[in-house]
């Protein structure tokens, strides 16, 4: 039986995560009912559970098939037990490292070849058949950020130092326009981890990243370029390594149909984005067949247009809010 592996770290079992998992499960099953879908999710903040979230947790447990749940301790123990390395304090300082460790586990222990990383703040706006066919054929799937080509480049100099100028040459051959790729939705060839399975090479992988908090020593949140570097390390690892070391030629999705943008700035095709319009600037983002409501936006929390779309989906599928 063919299978699709979907994995990520999500905040908690709540309405948003139920929507995300149900949406992609339903899209795939409507196209290919005989495909096995496996979800591997690290639930990061279980202390957020309450009576409302308890309802969504029960729905996740009943409606989402083949769901494998993890917590941070599982992967801390994975690193300790298999590699005799204690990085727990570093991991707590920079939690996005779990995005790197989780697929390593899926490759090394579960022996999977490919997975789709999928955030819980994504709308799938078409029938998804094009994407599913690529995933089933284990072709890396890359969606670009046309307004931020540097979104996945913070590690490029480190990786060139490690692998030599051949790394840059291979990257240029497969991504000649140096597009930047979003890691909230990406089909990843897990063979990129094969060079990091031994203890010394796994430690080498962990030491590739800077373990910095998004808060300074006074407890103030860091912004600007320093925050950008902290936040995009894992995205850079996936975007660069997946392009260079995937066994199959990656599919860079057509930027006219698939793109990830914030709710401000100037889109190269659609022009200036007005974040004070009726969609709070997300009207252009909604033109993409995959809309990712990325974090660097005006305003706190997820935008109203996304939350409304979630509610519309749930009601349409007969789930009470």
Locations of the language-model features?
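Short, acidic, metal-binding catalytic loop of nucleotide-sugar glycosyltransferases
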Residues: 24-35
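Short, flexible, basic/aromatic active-site loop/helix in glycosyltransferases
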Residues: 160-177
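A glycosyltransferase accessory/donor-loop signature
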Residues: 6-7, 20-23, 172-178, 190-321
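Short, charged/polar "capping" segments at the starts of alpha-helices
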Residues: 14-17, 45-55, 151-152
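Extreme N-terminal starter segment of soluble prokaryotic enzymes
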Residues: 1-4
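Short beta-strand/loop segment that forms part of the nucleotide-sugar
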Residues: 37-46
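GT-A fold catalytic core of metal-dependent nucleotide-sugar glycosyltransferases
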Residues: 69, 99-153, 188
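Active-site-proximal specificity loops/subdomain of glycosyltransferases
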Residues: 48-110
């Amino acid at each position: 039986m063919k299978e699709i592996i979907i994995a990520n770290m999500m905040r908690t079992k709540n309405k948003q995560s139920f929507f995300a998992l149900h949406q992609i499960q339903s899209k795939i099953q409507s196209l290919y009912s005989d495909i096995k879908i496996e979800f591997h999710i690290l639930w990061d903040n279980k202390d957020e559970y309450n009576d409302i979230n308890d309802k969504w947790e029960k729905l996740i447990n009943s409606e989402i098939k083949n769901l494998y749940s993890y917590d941070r301790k599982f992967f801390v123990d994975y690193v300790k037990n298999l590699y005799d390395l204690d990085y727990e304090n570093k991991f707590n300082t920079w939690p996005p490292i779990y995005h790197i460790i989780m697929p390593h586990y899926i490759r090394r222990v579960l022996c999977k070849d490919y997975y789709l990383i999928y955030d819980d703040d994504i709308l799938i706006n078409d029938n998804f058949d094009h994407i599913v066919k690529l995933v089933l054929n284990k072709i890396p799937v890359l969606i670009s950020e046309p307004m931020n080509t540097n979104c996945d480049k913070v590690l490029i100099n480190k990786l060139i130092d490690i692998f030599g100028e051949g790394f840059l040459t291979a990257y240029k051959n497969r991504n000649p326009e140096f597009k930047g790729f979003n890691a909230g939705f990406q089909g990843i060839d897990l063979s990129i981890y094969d060079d990091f399975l031994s203890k010394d090479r796994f430690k080498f992988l962990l030491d590739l990243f800077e373990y910095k908090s998004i808060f300074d020593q006074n407890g103030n949140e860091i912004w600007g370029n320093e925050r950008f570097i902290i936040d995009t390390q894992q995205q850079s690892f996936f975007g660069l390594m997946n392009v260079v070391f995937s066994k199959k030629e990656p599919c860079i999705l057509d930027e006219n149909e698939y793109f990830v943008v914030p709710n401000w700035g100037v889109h190269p095709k659609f022009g200036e984005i007005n974040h004070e319009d009726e969609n709070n600037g997300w009207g252009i983002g909604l033109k993409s067949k995959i809309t990712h409501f990325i974090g660097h936006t005006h305003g706190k929390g997820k935008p109203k247009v996304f939350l409304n779309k979630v509610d519309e989906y749930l009601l349409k599928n007969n789930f009470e809010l």
